[in-house]
From Swiss-Prot:
Disulfide bonds: none annotated. Belongs to the ABC transporter superfamily. Residues 15-244 form the ABC transporter domain. Residues 489-717 form the ABC transmembrane type-2 domain. It is found in: Membrane. It comes from Dictyostelium discoideum. It is a multi-pass membrane protein. Residues 281-303 are annotated as: Disordered. The gene is abcG20. ATP binds at residues 47-54. It holds the Pfam family ABC2_membrane_3. This is ABC transporter G family member 20. The lineage of its organism: Eukaryota, Amoebozoa, Evosea, Eumycetozoa, Dictyostelia. GO terms for molecular function: ABC-type transporter activity; ATP binding; ATP hydrolysis activity; ATPase-coupled transmembrane transporter activity. GO terms for biological process: sorocarp development.
Length: 730
């Protein structure tokens, strides 16, 4: 025992927490905590749920900033260059934090890319870890199909892969076979002997006997710490569990005294309080006497803080020995803008590749991403914008001349009407009331004679020269089309039979823009193509971060120093190939499947569609970053999409809006994109046209703004951290 203690005393401090306090709201989780851990040791944090174990780990990793106090990891504060978070740390969270769509090989390859491990070194390390942890060799099997114990071992493999100097394991042996657990502890001991500092949290108290030090936690404070055998001997116990029980009882007794001193309404006698106090004093005296032999010499350890601590261990993966031998040079290199940009780029590519593999392996998601936009545009062109056909219409034709019948025949040839002859107006109106007919044309007996008189004698009007129309006017679109066709057919008939032009307006050809015979679908198509790509881009990214936040995957990436910008750009890269395929197929269906005219540059059409889809992706990432569960993300996506659909001018001209509301559609990216698409496709204009270049400018501005918000929202947990660090360093 004495030799072990002497060895520990010769080691340098790896972690130091001084007077650290951290709470959530008004609740303090850890209060005035002091903790020192020496390098090359195995340390167990033991405590019930809510005792502060996870908060301590997150504080050490730099994910939480203490409300007060100081945290040093290898002599550096969290987020200092070359410290935590970063590849110096290996982290195995309790949740597992794995990507269940990936295989074991894909998982380890992804994290090797994150840590920039050389390929030859990665292969040897991978084989070593697979053998150690008895991991399955089935490369085609997803991690999600493994048992709970196997998943835990995969998570542990990820933490060990890059040979970190600091290893933080949250419940690493839960659900693992006893033999494998024993092998893991033996391996951890060999790592500690080589200089790796290991922190373990566990509920299995007796399992901590194999560690160098245990920290017994309760209600955010350390009840006791020291070597396991020493604590067992000191408290005259058989097991650590018994030691913990005695300490909890002592803590309860102390709490009683403290509460009674602060409470005038005593429910205990003075003698009871004196007895409890004397018991606590005796225990505390024993603790003070023994701590002189067991606790670290903090003053000496603090003097040992220097950069040499980084030189007496194995080199970090991906950093050359030359860099490691010159810590200042390494620090200067890592602090350079080009190096940081290069690191962000590498992480983005790694995350993008991982995301793409996840999509490819998930057949449901892949089918949705490939087929959904195509199905939507097909349904749109089939269901919207066409003219109604075979409308049930009644006719009461009492005209003794030929014009009434000629007019009905002209209407029948349009294909819009399916006429039924009735003998009486009352009978035909009843069919409208019963829903069997949309309307009725009632032609009186003198119609032909009267209409000719009206043409010949303009000074006298004969009311018999008109046809009475009865209709169900509740369907606005059908009413509009019917009235338009009734007028158009009569104009055509008058011109054919009497060479009379009823409409004094002449359309001059060639037109300035467009085709006078264009259909409503031609007006809708450009905007709908934009909106479908925009909406689908939102849907595929709006849940991207939610699951990763819940299962701890994001926390693991943050612990390894991956920036939020890398995560956001990585998701862009992962979805980009499929997004380009989707938009290509969507435009091909519109142009060649339904003959939507494109008078302008097809490249501009494609670029505008892709740009708006990028805005949709970035908006989806914002939604994902602020959502706690997937249902929230879905609801927010719908809440964003429908106002955009309604107010973008796709379904109805913006000129119809009230003046006080015009500002809202004009700030939406889909509004400008839809108008620009319509101008390019129907007018044939290019970037010189104001509406087109303004649209590109607005869409680009929205893209930059939303990416910034996505990074900020995803990084919200670190906001107070950076402000606090800034204040401290001022």
């Amino acid at each position: 025992m004495s030799n072990s203690n002497n060895n520990n005393n010769n080691k340098k401090l790896a972690i130091s927490l001084k007077n650290v306090c951290r709470g959530y709201g008004n609740t303090k989780v850890i209060d005035n905590l002091n903790l020192q851990i020496k390098s090359g040791t195995i340390n167990c944090l033991i405590g019930a749920s809510g005792s502060g174990k996870t908060t301590i780990l997150r504080t050490i990793l730099g994910r939480l900033i203490p409300d007060s106090g100081e945290v040093l990891v290898f002599g550096k504060r969290p987020h200092d260059i070359g410290g935590v978070p970063g590849s110096i740390c290996g982290f195995c969270p309790q949740e597992g934090a794995l990507y269940y769509d990936l295989t074991l090989d894909h998982t380890l390859n992804f994290f090797s890319n994150v840590h920039q491990i050389p390929k030859d070194k990665f292969e040897s390390k991978k084989n070593e870890i697979i053998k150690l942890l008895d991991l399955p060799q089935i490369n085609s099997r997803s991690v999600g199909l493994l048992s709970g114990g196997q998943k835990k071992r995969v998570s542990l493999a990820v933490a060990l892969l890059h040979s970190p100097k600091l290893l933080i394991l949250d419940e690493p042996t839960v659900g693992i076979d006893m033999e494998v657990a024993s092998n893991i502890w033996s391996y951890l001991r060999s790592l500690a002997n080589s200089g790796v500092t290991i922190i373990i949290t566990t509920h299995y108290i007796n399992e901590a006997v194999g560690s160098d030090n245990v920290f017994l936690l309760r209600d955010g404070k350390i009840l006791e710490n020291g070597a396991p055998n020493y604590l067992i001997e000191r408290y005259e116990s058989q097991t650590l569990e018994e030691v913990f029980l005695k300490l909890c009882k002592r803590d309860n007794a102390q709490s009683i005294v403290d509460s009674k001193k602060n409470n005038n309404n005593s429910y205990f006698s003075s003698q009871e309080i004196i007895d409890v106090e004397s018991h606590i004093v005796n225990n505390n005296n024993n603790n003070n006497n023994n701590n002189n032999n067991n606790n670290y010499n903090n003053n000496d350890d603090e003097e040992n803080y220097n950069d040499d601590i980084y030189n007496d261990k194995k080199p970090l993966i991906g950093i050359s020995k030359e860099d490691e031998n010159n810590t200042n040079g390494s620090t200067n290199k890592e602090s350079g803008i080009l190096f940081r940009f290069y690191k962000v780029l590498l992480h983005s590519v790694a995350i993008g590749k991982r995301k793409f593999i996840q999509i490819i392996r998930n057949k449901v998601v892949l089918s949705f991403e490939l087929l959904s936009p195509s199905v939507q545009v097909l349904l749109y062109f089939l269901a919207i914008g066409g003219s109604p056909k075979n409308l049930e219409f009644g006719v009461v034709n009492l005209d003794v001349g030929p014009i009434g019948s000629m007019y009905i025949n002209s209407l029948s040839n349009t294909g819009i009407f399916n006429f039924h002859n009735y003998n009486s107006t009352t009978e035909a109106i009843e069919q409208i009331k019963s829903g069997n007919s949309f309307g009725l044309l009632d032609i009186n007996a003198q119609f032909s004679e009267a209409i000719l008189e009206n043409f010949m004698n303009l000074s006298q009007y004969n009311p018999n020269g008109q046809i009475d129309l009865y209709m169900d006017f509740t369907n606005y679109q059908i009413t509009l089309i019917v009235e338009q066709q009734l007028a158009l057919s009569f104009e055509t008939l008058a011109k054919q039979q009497a060479n009379i032009t009823m409409n004094p307006i002449k359309t001059v050809t060639p037109t300035v823009y467009g085709n006078p015979n264009s259909k409503f679908i031609d007006f809708l198509a450009p905007g709908m193509v934009c909106l479908i790509s925009f909406a689908h881009a939102i849907s595929i990214t709006s849940v991207s971060f939610v699951k990763e936040k819940v299962d701890g995957s994001l926390d693991r990436l943050f612990a390894y120093g991956v920036r939020t910008s890398s995560i956001v750009f990585g998701h862009f890269l992962g979805h980009l190939p499929l997004l380009l395929v989707q938009i290509t197929v969507l435009l091909l269906i519109a142009i060649y499947g339904f003959n939507v005219p494109i008078e302008g540059n097809i490249a501009l059409v494609f670029l505008m569609t892709v740009s708006l889809a990028f805005v949709g992706m970035s908006l989806g990432l914002v939604i994902s970053a602020v959502s706690r569960v997937e249902t929230e993300a879905i609801q927010l996506s719908l809440g964003v999409y429908f106002p955009t659909l309604i107010c973008s001018g796709t379904l109805w001209p913006l000129q119809s809006l009230p003046n006080w509301f015009v500002w809202f559609p004009n700030i939406l990216p889909a509004t400008h994109a839809g108008n620009a698409m319509r101008d390019i496709m129907l007018k044939g204009v290019g970037l010189h046209y104001k509406e087109v270049w303004v649209a590109f400018l607005v869409v680009l501005s929205w893209l930059i703004f939303l990416i910034f918000i996505a990074v900020l929202a995803l990084n919200e947990k670190d906001k107070n951290l950076k402000l606090s660090c800034f204040k401290k360093r001022k």
